[in-house]
Curated annotation (Swiss-Prot):
Virion surface side: 17-579
Gene name as annotated: G
Species name: Tibrogargan virus (strain CS132) (TIBV)
Protein name: Glycoprotein
Transmembrane segments: 580-605
Gene3D superfamilies: 2.30.29.130
Length: 662
């Protein structure tokens, strides 16, 4: 068999690798945007890699079409978030009537039965909004009041009509028990209300269609012989190529019936009906597509076994193409960079415009659009909000390799929708032209046109008859840190002073990166629906900081609660006593301390003086006693001497006296 060379020329890698062919850029732009779900950190995910090629082949190929139902605005499935909170109020009162009130919220475990019971109550209009119980304070005691509420919040989700699964950043669709799903918020569940009717999609006159090319792939086989090396080529199977879906191997498809029509489920999860004429290469085997297995035969996207590979119509090892290999390696690198960025965002809660481009969907269809929102109550903090949009590939004419478009240099229209040939202006995309009229050293003065894309209520239709609106597609906003620059969805920026639009991607941001693309912004993600409600309802006009709101859950805040005007006269007395002790308590303590210090000092001095006099008195008494003793002793000696003289005198008289003498 003669070798047939298939030359694949890379034109575009949609968002990831936009390459200019003539001066134009292919960009995945959001249309028909609606308010999206409340974003959480866990809901941020990296998009699916998506490659598109343009085929230049000398082999016979078949031209065909691929069609599918249009994504409908009714693909939103009604549902509710269900969670149980215990709102706790604690009052601690001291002996001198000083009170400290603490509020905190505890997320309780909730069962499926409790959720459905609360949903029935909600539909009857008897749902009670949560609140903190009134504090009950008792003298020299700590008292706690609790109130438990089962909360129900409406939360519509995007439904994948082909798989019947939910696509929502808050809900784990793989962890659902019928109509009861686990969410990524703590102790929070999602309840399905009703499934939408899919019969409206089955009218094929309203389906969207795109041209495709189908051809056989070839693989070169190297055979080493003793004297030489030869190459032969083996036909592997069918390849389908479209600038809308990229270059897809038939080995990656499986058969799936939708709307009672046979079609194929693609790797990105989309369903398409493939139509082609049976000529040339396919006349010899026009049933080759029917050899594919049904989607239920294997988990879609898993690696094929050898047995399954034998039953498929193509192989993954198409003819080696260095450009294609290089692009796949770059695609993997971009995906790794996105994962690293995502880890950094979750750890630091900081995000920049460049990060937005990594999160942007890479293929047409339903997807989320990300944009910054500055906190109205604290301009130093930002939120990341999302829109639920229908993405379409558009040609942006006269854009350079950096993604720049000078909107004053080229005449409008400058945009063409791929496959539909609809010519649009930038105003049709929702990007209003603005002028910076700010004088030197003056206050900011920016004037913009009123038209910012068609509204949902307008009768704006494309050439295929489908309605479209872009009033919220750009969602541009001005920030104090970046004067003269409007930052829109997915990192699209509008430099008003230079009149330059920039459509960012993960490849063209490597050139001349402006400082505002890399500036980190502190972003806040509400991780639980309770915080949304507190922020919206509980605080009212209070400009309480977001970080304080975080402390309301599983922690507490302290505040002194004085008696109000409706308290009785006993409460007023308590208030006065508390006020008195609060103001003079410190002074009284100081005075008492000084008095005690003075008294202690005086006592110490007196004791010291007494101790100083006591040793002298003791010495004098001892001396006196010694003198008396010596005097007595001397007297005794004198008396003895006198007696001796008496006896001597008597004896000397010649007469001796004897008492016994008769």
């Amino acid at each position: 068999m003669e070798a047939i060379t298939i030359e694949i020329i890379i034109i575009i890698l949609t968002i990831s690798y936009p390459i200019l062919v003539a001066p134009q850029l292919l960009y995945n732009y959001p249309f028909n945007c609606k308010k999206g779900p409340k974003m959480t950190l866990d809901g941020l995910t990296c998009p699916l890699d998506f490659n598109t090629f343009n085929l230049d082949s000398k082999d016979n190929m078949e031209a065909g079409t691929m069609c599918r139902p249009n994504p409908l605005s009714k693909d939103i499935e009604d549902g509710f978030l269900c969670y149980k909170d215990t709102w706790v109020t604690t009052c601690e009162e001291t002996w001198y009537f000083s009170k400290t009130v603490k509020n905190h919220i505890i997320h309780e475990h909730i069962t499926k039965d409790e959720c459905f019971e609360a949903l029935a109550t909600y539909k009857l209009g008897k749902h009670v909004e949560p609140f903190f119980p009134a504090p009950s304070c008792y003298w020299s005691a700590t008292n706690e009041e609790r109130a438990t509420f089962v909360n129900i919040q409406p939360h519509g989700v995007l439904l994948d009509p082909y798989s019947g699964k939910i696509k929502d950043p808050l809900i784990d669709s793989d962890n659902c028990d019928n109509d009861f799903c686990v969410t990524r918020s703590h102790q929070t569940h999602w309840l399905r209300n009703r499934k939408p009717d899919i019969m409206e999609r089955c009218n094929n006159e309203t389906w969207e269609c795109h041209p495709i090319k189908i051809y056989y792939g070839w693989v070169s086989k190297k055979k080493n012989q003793e004297t030489s090396t030869t190459f032969n080529y083996v036909q592997t199977g069918l390849v389908i190529e479209s600038q809308y879906i990229g270059h897809v191997l038939m080995a990656d498809l499986c058969i799936m019936t939708f709307c009672n029509r046979d079609g194929y489920l693609f790797p990105d999860g989309s369903w398409w009906e493939i139509k082609y004429s049976l000529y040339h290469a396919f006349t010899k085997d026009h049933t080759v597509l029917n050899n594919a297995h049904k989607c239920g035969d294997r988990t879609h996207g898993d690696h094929l076994t050898e047995f399954q590979r034998d039953k498929k119509v193509g192989y993954e090892d198409l003819e080696i193409n260095l450009e294609g290999l290089e692009m796949r390696q770059k695609s993997r690198s971009i995906n790794m960079m996105c994962l690293n960025r995502l880890a950094e965002i979750r750890n630091t809660h900081h995000i920049n415009v460049l990060d937005m481009s990594y999160l942007t969907p890479k293929h047409p269809g339903r997807g989320l659009a990300y944009y910054f929102s500055q906190d109205q109550k604290n301009s130093s903090k930002y939120h990341v909000k999302v829109l639920d949009c229908d993405y379409k590939l558009i040609h942006i004419h006269d854009a350079d390799i950096k993604g720049f478009v000078n909107i004053t240099k080229y005449p409008e229209p400058n945009v063409t929708i791929l496959g539909l040939k609809d010519n649009l202006t930038f105003a049709d995309l929702g990007i209003s032209r603005c002028q910076d009229l700010t004088p030197l050293n003056g206050s900011r003065n920016i004037s913009c046109e009123e038209s910012s894309g068609p509204l949902h209520s307008d009768d704006s239709r494309l050439s295929n008859g489908k309605r479209f609106w872009t009033r919220h597609s750009f969602q541009g906003a001005n920030f104090h840190e970046h004067p003269g620059v409007r930052i829109g969805v997915n990192g699209i920026t509008y430099d008003i002073r230079k009149q330059i639009l920039r459509f960012p991607s993960t490849s063209n941001l490597l050139w001349d990166l402006p400082s505002y693309y890399s500036t980190k912004h502190r972003v806040h993600f509400f991780q639980h629906p309770t915080k949304h409600e507190i922020r919206k309802n509980f605080t009212g006009s209070d400009s309480r900081d977001i970080d304080v709101l975080d402390d309301l859950i599983n922690r507490h805040i302290n505040r002194t609660d004085f008696p109000t005007r409706i308290r009785n006269w006993i409460g007023n007395i308590e208030d006065k006593v508390e006020h008195f002790f609060s103001n003079v308590g410190g002074t009284i303590k100081t005075i008492i301390s000084l008095v005690l210090f003075v008294i202690g000092t005086l006592i110490s001095i007196k004791v010291w003086k007494k101790c100083k006099r006591h040793p002298q008195k003791t010495k004098k008494v001892a001396q006196l006693k010694l003198n008396d003793y010596e005097k007595t002793y001397n007297q005794r000696d004198t008396s003895n001497n006198n007696n001796d003289d008496l006896y001597e005198t008597i004896e000397n008289g010649g007469t001796v006296y004897s008492p016994f003498h008769v």
